[in-house]
């Protein structure tokens, strides 16, 4: 993957991806998340995906994509630590496979740039009807999260964990703000994104001439905008604190327990391989300690797994437990972490986890979407404002092969519990309270 700076705050990353019969053009907008515009930016991709100036409704857009041999347009948003990311992506077959020699890549470029820079406006703002429809969809999604107690517990724990820090901005939006959003507010948020976002153009499966044409078309669009890209927020970590225990009571069959840990300092890119193996050993695989011991041996959890967020240097352990077993489950989870830090790690479990990770990483390059996700996250993880080298999947696999038990223990020893959040129908709180 080649990455070059083509304008202030704008990079081009490209790969010919010759083994695929499809190509992909993606435009990523990344900018610091802000509390006051979080809900508008959560709504933005839903409205943008409905169409653009040349295809102002979903019917015409669907017909256009169908004529291009079933091309696909997606506009989505995803949180990246303290930064927000909106991506416009078009995927379709390469020119070489067009039955009548159509210039498909040029059409994909028009669609991607149209969706990104020429949305369908009515009187200078997003279409009020489209905004109204998508507000209901966003509202329903946020309401559904409350009913999914696993997600709700994680969000409540995150709110307690991050507090007022930039990573605490709820980038999925705030339910109480959805009804108040207007087309004018959404348009203002969109225009702010165009002015201030760092832009990553990823072109996969195109030759050099096609890539250059896509680059030039993007630069022509940007020339019409008074750009002032903001520096992205670098990776962070919450400071270590005395553990905070919170309990909410709900009438539910299964209690939910979410425990959040912090590294205490930002994760460095060179630590990533050890972090991956540490998570697989602790709770990220079917051979992990949490799965084999807390779930299978002790029968304390219906599920119990760990995950790590590199942008915020935090680990989450999520579990579903019997109400009466919540305190025991928490202590068992902490014990497994302590045992990995100070006790033996067998060669068998260590290599099982390593092989499992390597097997999963072997599939990264099996799809254009996988390649794009890998490299874009690597860009952000390394620091989008820096010239740090970007790690390829093969380099990451080699780094994983070199990780030692001591390196894994060093990562795990840095993790300290900050928040333990319990949803239960019983009034009994954690044993630690």
Give residue spans per PLM region:
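M16 family metallopeptidases and their MPP-like homologs
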Residues: 13-15, 21-41, 58-114, 150-173, ...
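Short, Gly/Pro- and small/polar-rich lid/capping loops
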Residues: 1-9
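A conserved active-site cap/scaffold subdomain adjacent to cofactor or substrate pockets
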Residues: 252-256, 264-267, 272-284
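Acidic/histidine-enriched alpha-helical segments
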Residues: 62, 118-142, 229-239, 335, ...
């Amino acid at each position: 993957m080649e990455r070059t700076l083509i304008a202030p705050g704008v990079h081009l990353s490209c790969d010919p991806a010759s083994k695929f019969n499809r190509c992909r053009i993606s435009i990523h907008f990344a900018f610091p998340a802000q509390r006051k515009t979080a809900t508008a930016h959560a709504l933005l991709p839903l409205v943008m995906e409905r169409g653009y100036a040349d295809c102002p409704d979903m019917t015409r857009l669907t017909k256009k994509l169908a004529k291009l041999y079933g091309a696909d347009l997606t506009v989505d948003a995803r949180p990246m630590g303290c930064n927000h990311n909106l991506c416009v992506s078009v995927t379709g077959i390469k020119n070489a496979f067009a039955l009548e020699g159509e210039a498909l890549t040029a059409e994909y470029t028009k669609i991607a740039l149209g969706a990104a820079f020429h949305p369908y406006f009515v009187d200078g703002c997003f279409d009020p009807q489209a905004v109204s429809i998508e507000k209901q969809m966003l509202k329903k999604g946020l309401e559904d999260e409350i009913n999914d107690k696993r997600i709700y517990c994680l969000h409540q724990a995150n709110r307690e964990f991050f507090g007022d820090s930039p990573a605490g901005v709820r980038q999925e939006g705030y339910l109480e703000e959805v009804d108040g959003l207007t087309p004018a507010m959404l348009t203002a948020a969109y225009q702010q994104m165009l002015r201030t976002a760092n832009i990553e153009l990823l072109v996969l499966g195109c030759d050099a001439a096609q890539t250059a044409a896509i680059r030039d078309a993007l630069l022509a669009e940007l020339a019409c905008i008074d750009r002032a890209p903001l520096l992205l927020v670098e990776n962070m970590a919450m400071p270590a604190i005395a553990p905070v225990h919170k309990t909410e009571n709900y009438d539910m069959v299964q209690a939910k327990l979410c425990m959040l840990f912090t590294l205490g300092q930002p994760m460095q890119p060179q630590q990533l391989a050890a972090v991956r193996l540490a998570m697989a050993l602790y709770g990220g695989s079917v051979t992990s300690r949490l799965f084999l011991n807390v779930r299978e041996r002790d029968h304390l959890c219906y599920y119990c797994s760990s995950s790590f967020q590199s942008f915020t240097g935090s680990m989450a352990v999520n579990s579903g437990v019997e109400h009466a077993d919540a305190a025991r489950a928490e202590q068992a989870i902490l014990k497994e972490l302590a045992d990995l830090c100070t006790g033996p790690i067998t060669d068998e479990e260590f290599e099982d986890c390593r092989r499992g990770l390597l097997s999963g990483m072997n599939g990264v390059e099996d799809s254009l979407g996988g390649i794009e996700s890998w490299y874009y996250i690597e860009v952000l993880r390394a620091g989008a404002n820096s010239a740090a080298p970007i790690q390829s999947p093969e380099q990451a696999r080699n780094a994983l092969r070199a990780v030692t038990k001591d390196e894994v223990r060093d990562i795990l020893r840095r993790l300290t519990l900050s928040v333990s959040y319990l949803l239960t129908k019983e009034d009994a709180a954690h044993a630690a309270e």
